[in-house]
Amino acid sequence: MRYEEINLGYEKNLVRYYLTGYDRVAKFYHYNPWNTRSFYDRADYLKDKSNPEALYNLLSFYLKDFALDQKVVENLDKIKKGAFIVLTGQQPGFLTGPLYTIYKAVHAIIEAKRLSELLNHEVVPLFWIGSEDHDVEEVNFLYFPGKEGPQEIKIEFTDLRKIPAGLRPAEPETVEAIEKFEGLLPNFDYKEEVFTEIKKAYHSANLGQAFARLMLKLFGKFGLLVYDGLNPEFKRVTKGYLKNAFLKRDAIEKALFKVYTEQQSLGIEPQLDPCPNHCNMFIFKNDERIALEVAGEKVVSRDGEVSFTREEFLEFMERYPEKLSPNLVVRTSIQSLVFPVLAYVAGPGEIGYYGMLKEVYEIMGTQMPVILPRFTATLIEPRVEKALKEFALLPQEIYQDYDGVFHRVLERLDNLGIDDTFKALKESINSAYKNLQEKLAPLGADFQKLTGENLGRVMAQVKYLEERAQKYHREKNSKYIEKLWYLKTNFLPENEWQERVYNVFYYLAKYGFALIEKLLGIPFNPGKHYLLYLE
């Protein structure tokens, strides 16, 4: 696969500084990702911090229900022998969600291999499945490139309660959405093979299980481990850490408010809003995930239907850890207390929220790992590349100023010089009316006003004529406009980067599962954007 590395900027200050001016934000992180020494320091810190045997048992217990490639089994054995982990993760989106989920897994696998060689110590990739997330709007859709632009497939769930994705059954609504997706796709070369695997993944499964099956299908032969934080065994293992987070809730709240204020003073938009009185955890009630808050001496659910005294809640935490769920603020540090996380492969948003959690990690008695910025990418199909060449355009031009590109191309196609012609006409009319007003000034102010009003009506007619000329011009060049729209919907579908919208299974149905191996053959660098040319 041909590829090209380019630079695309970020609007958010913190991410931009993290990538190109790290010193300005270094105070918010424990390790500098751009300094190789950081990985040695992190490895030294991790020594003797975890129990490899217990970690192996934890992962094996979860993975025993899945068909595992030999490479996954080998990496589990490496965990047992003290391997470090490159971690990444995402909610279990529909058919893995947007492309960036795939890129996270790819980058974690690549970094694990690179860091193993750098440190001369085994490092394995692990994908954390955020099945506890209860926002159905995050996991109930996918987009793919349609004939007229982005096409959406949505799972029409009938149960809209705050049920974690890992407790939401895939059948029947998700299966119906898959069938709709299959029916809308052209008969691509690999379509049948791909949809056979998709249907196997979602058969008799919840969304978390189906996601895990798909990720293991795509990346198992490359050794990617997966783990679901909703697993009851993980709750039991981590109940002491969650209890510690509750006991130190006040200190965590103060730390968040402190960094929030500090980042605002530096002109950085904080990624997390501190929530006063939040317990930093949720309770599962009738399968719904409800936030817990402190109200005086009590712990209450946000819906007001559950209430504990402090002592009762501590007892509940001890007896029923599987009924509690950490929020993002404390989940990340709990992950680092359980897993020997050498580095975390983070997207732009994650870089932002990790930048608010350094002191939370310290309160919890640990450090955050090296935060590695995930590469970003654009898949460019042959037809897209052909259109770029036809208009002599660079992809970054479309990313940075599509509207400007659109108008420049239309101007190039305008051999009549419509803009210049009407500009000259308007200047000529304005000049003529100015001369007229000067010559007829003796007729008085009322006549001057009448002349001005008349000019306004004339210019309105000129504007109308110009708009009609532009309309005829666009219609005459409609095929070029359609190609420009095609380019936009490939690079900026829904006005977002391609990787944040389109789903990988459209491309797998067209180019085959070998596409994954091709991605893993590219030496991606952290924080860079790549143009990936499909063939």
Swiss-Prot record:
Put simply, this protein is called: Putative cysteine ligase BshC
Stretches assigned to coiled coil = 420-477
| GO molecular function annotation | ligase activity
The family assignment reads:
Belongs to the BshC family.
Pfam families given in the database record: CC_BshC, Rossmann-like_BshC
| Organism of this sequence | Carboxydothermus hydrogenoformans (strain ATCC BAA-161 / DSM 6008 / Z-2901)
Q: What does the UniProt function comment say about this protein?
A: Involved in bacillithiol (BSH) biosynthesis. May catalyze the last step of the pathway, the addition of cysteine to glucosamine malate (GlcN-Mal) to generate BSH.
Q: What is its EC number?
A: 6.-.-.-
HAMAP family the record matches: BshC
What NCBIfam families does the record tag this protein with? Answer: thiol_BshC
Q: What is the enzyme's class at the highest EC level? A: ligase
Q: Which domain of life is it from?
A: Bacteria
- Keywords carried by this UniProt record: Coiled coil, Ligase
